[in-house]
Amino acid sequence: MPRALWTAWVWAXIILSTEGASDQASSLSCDSTGVCDGHSRSLNSIPSGLTAGVKSLDLSNNEITYVGNRDLQRCVNLKTLRLGANEIHTVEEDSFFHLRNLEYLDLSYNRLSNLSSSWFRSLYVLKFLNLLGNLYKTLGETSLFSHLPNLXTLKVGNSNSFTEIHEKDFTGLTFLEELEISAQNLQIYVPKSLKSIQNISHLILHLKQPVLLVDILVDIVSSLDCLELRDTNLHTFHFSEASISEMSTSVKKLIFRNVQFTDESFVEVVKLFNYVSGILEVEFDDCTHDGIGDFRALSLDRIRHLGNVETLTIRKLHIPQFFLFHDLSSIYPLTGKVKRVTIENSKVFLVPCLLSQHLKSLEYLDLSENLMSEETLKNSACKDAWPFLQTLVLRQNRLKSLEKTGELLLTLENLNSLDISKNNFLSMPETCQWPGKMKQLNLSSTRIHSLTQCLPQTLEILDVSNNNLDSFSLILPQLKELYISRNKLKTLPDASFLPVLSVMRISRNIINTFSKEQLDSFQQLKTLEAGGNNFICSCDFLSFTQGQQALGRVLVDWPDDYRCDSPSHVRGQRVQDARLSLSECHRAAVVSAACCALFLVLLLTGVLCHRFHGLWYMKMMWAWLQAKRKPRKAPRRDICYDAFVSYSERDSYWVENLMVQELEQFNPPFKLCLHKRDFIPGKWIIDNIIDSIEKSHKTIFVLSENFVXSEWCKYELDFSHFRLFDENNDAAILILLEPIDKKAIPQRFCKLRKIMNTKTYLEWPVDETQQEGFWLNLRAAIRS
């Protein structure tokens, strides 16, 4: 029994493990190009069943703890492997041995406490390696990256345990585009550890304290293009002039990101600018200045300039003691060579006039997202301020008057580009004054609802996007580029107002159409962006847009951003794909064709009615309907005649002199109804015929060639035909006065023809000896 239980337990474990592996494999989603996504799937191991078809594998943000030698051995074509944000603590020696095509490897933020060079010995084409955020203290006992000749991006270190950098650590690396070292607790830096790298385009250093910063600078200053310092407290930073003064430098850019300064350490950094002569650009991003700006007692006055720095960028500068801050007059002399300054989102409300006057080389000034107003701008743009300034950006400040803003900037004689977007101007005056060389103006997101002659006529580029404009009727003879998206325009501007326009972006308005003629009127237009509008996909619009093969070269957002809004059955479709029916596009032609078809149908109907006696059928139908209103069969008391006689006028002699004499003078006499004698004068002939036939017991037809051609006889025969058809009786008596071909009786009298074919009729004998028998038979037929 225990053995049976043991066997069952083993099989259960095998089944569960198989199901688990199957579940993990199924948790990957792979596309046809070999890109497999398995991130954030709660995987605790690398899925089995991976093949050579996998080219990119993302297993980040899972719970994987172990990478074995066989886990990836079939992925011989793998180029990208992401294993970041797992719990990996062990990677076997040959885990990546078969990945000879691997170019991107991310092992960041795991639990690796030891690194092995054997992991990378076959990764000759590896270009990107991220080892950040693990638990190792050093980069291994041997040179870790000596087998990676093509490595371009390397990220190493962590924020806690990584404390040592040794000379062997980066041996074998010659050129790096980016090197990131996270070493907040760095305690040991062996000189020349980074010296072996001949060129580094961008070095990112995470250092909590600046103790070893100068030592690192000594090693890299001749091989580095850009140094970025992150998360560092520079309160105790001291720059040693002797350490770098005699060395050639290649550093062109310094970036300080989330760095804390004091007045003292800031002066030390300024000294660095002087001695590292190659620095052209300095950037401070999200930094904090823990001081009051009192640099006079710190020998800053002995520094005459900022070295060769031409570009200064400051973003999100925090000054906790802002209200105690000095006037910065001590740094004015340092700014003479600076050409480009950006101070963004730093609560700047004023640039002192003296500082503006010292910025004699300044060509570009960006004061976006600050607190500048017309009152403070007046002081900043004082006489002789920024004499060579060409571009001024005052985006998202507190400017309110467009007229006053333009007037205050008249002192800037060389200004040609002005960005005052995202200020609340609301309206535009009729006239304004601007610097004489103004060529570019940005008024986007300023809530203006109309444009006036306030705009300078010298403009070549105008941006009025994201406002409340519903029309554009300004004459700007030199304008080359117009940006007017996200407004309320219903049509394209008049080309005669903009004779040299080459670029127009007018997307997301309420334009519903434009024509070939409109586009052709812009003779120099090369770029048009008009997507995101509510286009009415009319036949003309579709014919124009779908028939112009070269349209895609002008419409930069064609075809995806051009969608139909109407008609409803094509709403949401791309204009390029929309199709309308023939009736929608050629309505006049369709109506004309329909009218012609209707005329032909009527003509054909008329011909057929004439050919097949359709008019007769309609007349008889009307007569029959009238007859249907009356009793189906008249009561006996309404029968006034023994017989109604239908005959041709040309046969009247035989009827009136022979038949009437024989029947009405017979004893007992027969009462006959003759149209000449008994029809009621003034009554409609059809009614006379109907009444006479209905009041007669029988109807006698005296058939002859004359009868067939008689119009009167036709009416009598017509209604009699309907009576025979409707009542199905034998009230008709046919007398053949002379031999007549049955074919002479019209085809439409099918019932009468049938009677002649199936029943006997009386034939008037030419032989007088047989005439007495004829009358005898006729009287018998009438009585029947």
UniProtKB/Swiss-Prot annotation:
Glycans are attached at N114, N199, N442. The chain crosses the membrane at residues 588-608. It is found in: Membrane; Cytoplasmic vesicle, Phagosome membrane; Membrane raft. Interacts with LY96, TLR1 and TLR6 (via extracellular domain). TLR2 seems to exist in heterodimers with either TLR1 or TLR6 before stimulation by the ligand. The heterodimers form bigger oligomers in response to their corresponding ligands as well as further heterotypic associations with other receptors such as CD14 and/or CD36. Binds MYD88 (via TIR domain). Interacts with TICAM1. Interacts with CNPY3. Interacts with ATG16L1. Interacts with PPP1R11. Interacts with TICAM2. Interacts with TIRAP. One of its GO terms (cellular component) is plasma membrane. A motif (ATG16L1-binding motif) lies at residues 761-778. GO terms for molecular function: NAD+ nucleosidase activity, cyclic ADP-ribose generating; transmembrane signaling receptor activity; triacyl lipopeptide binding. Its main location: membrane. Residues 525-579 form the LRRCT domain. The record marks F349 as: Interaction with bacterial lipopeptide. Ubiquitinated at Lys-754 by PPP1R11, leading to its degradation. Deubiquitinated by USP2. Ester-bound lipid substrates are bound through a crevice formed between the LRR 11 and LRR 12. The ATG16L1-binding motif mediates interaction with ATG16L1. Residues 1-20 form the signal peptide. The keyword Transcription does not apply. Cooperates with LY96 to mediate the innate immune response to bacterial lipoproteins and other microbial cell wall components. Cooperates with TLR1 or TLR6 to mediate the innate immune response to bacterial lipoproteins or lipopeptides. Acts via MYD88 and TRAF6, leading to NF-kappa-B activation, cytokine secretion and the inflammatory response. May also promote apoptosis in response to lipoproteins. It comes from the Eukaryota. Disulfide bonds join C30-C36, C353-C382, C432-C454. SMART domains: LRR_BAC (SM00364), LRR_SD22 (SM00365), LRR_TYP (SM00369), LRRCT (SM00082), TIR (SM00255). This is Toll-like receptor 2. It is a single-pass type I membrane protein.
